Amino acid sequence: MTRYKAIISYDGSGFYGYQVQPNTRTVQAEIEKALTKMHKGKTVRITASGRTDTGVHAKGQVIHFDSELDITAEKFQKALQVMTPFDISFLTVEEVPDDFHARFGTVGKEYRYVVKRTKIFDPFSRDFALHYPYELDISKMKLASKRLIGEHDFTSFCSARTERDSKVRTLYSIDFYEEDDETLVIAFQGNGFLYNMVRILTGTLLDAGQGRISPDDISKALLARDRQKLISKTAPPQGLYLWRVDYE
């Protein structure tokens, strides 16, 4: 039995999230269906670095699976690329030690959120970015982001449905890239992220950019440890990308 690590990308707009769910199309289900077919009907399960919600995309999701087939990693990659749908891509496949674990072995992740700042709605980017036709002061967003860097209890910045007992996470950096006059990309790097955390952080920073909240408001929300104390809404899923997963 050999363990394989794969880096995959996918367009999340056609999936009901990553994780297998009854009677819905998911990323995990499509990949496991292809692997099961390759193994002549024997069920093969995959493990990912984490789940993504409906409409959320991935540029660098990491999965692992075990196989007893006597084929190379390169042939696995080519076969899976052919056997999975057009909205999933296998960027790399490689053999890894048996103790590699896509989920429990992570030491950091990067998410990016894409904001289209056009006055007129662009129908061609509707599934891949948030349309935000309002004025934004990027300098205010950068100031606000500094209050979020470091180790904090992010209870105020995650969904009440978060299953983790500890809400303490470390944000290494928040960077802002203005790719052109119309596109703003916010990149979040940290040791881990809670359910809806990046989308709530994005909504908070957008509010800061409009002057609705101040850096002090963010500090108070962190200390409150209560999602209800934060007025910012959760940004919609279509602008969010799991960009990279890091391992030791």
From Swiss-Prot:
Catalysed reaction, written as an equation: uridine(38/39/40) in tRNA = pseudouridine(38/39/40) in tRNA
EC number: 5.4.99.12
Keyword terms, alphabetized: Isomerase, tRNA processing
Coiled coil: none
Active site (record annotation): D53
GO biological process: tRNA pseudouridine synthesis
Top-rank taxon, per record: Bacteria
Xref: Gene3D superfamilies: Pseudouridine synthase I, catalytic domain, C-terminal subdomain, Pseudouridine synthase I, catalytic domain, N-terminal subdomain
GO MF annotation list: RNA binding; tRNA pseudouridine(38-40) synthase activity
Keyword Isomerase: yes
Short name of one Pfam family: PseudoU_synth_1
Family annotation (InterPro entries): PsdUridine_synth_cat_dom_sf (IPR020103), PsdUridine_synth_TruA (IPR001406), PsdUridine_synth_TruA_a/b_dom (IPR020097), PsdUridine_synth_TruA_C (IPR020095), TruA/RsuA/RluB/E/F_N (IPR020094)
Binding-site list for substrate: Y111
Similarity section: Belongs to the tRNA pseudouridine synthase TruA family.
Stated role: Formation of pseudouridine at positions 38, 39 and 40 in the anticodon stem and loop of transfer RNAs.
Subunit structure: Homodimer.
Matches recorded under HAMAP family: TruA (MF_00171)
Name recorded for this polypeptide: tRNA pseudouridine synthase A
Organism listed in the record: Listeria monocytogenes serotype 4a (strain HCC23)
Gene behind the chain: truA
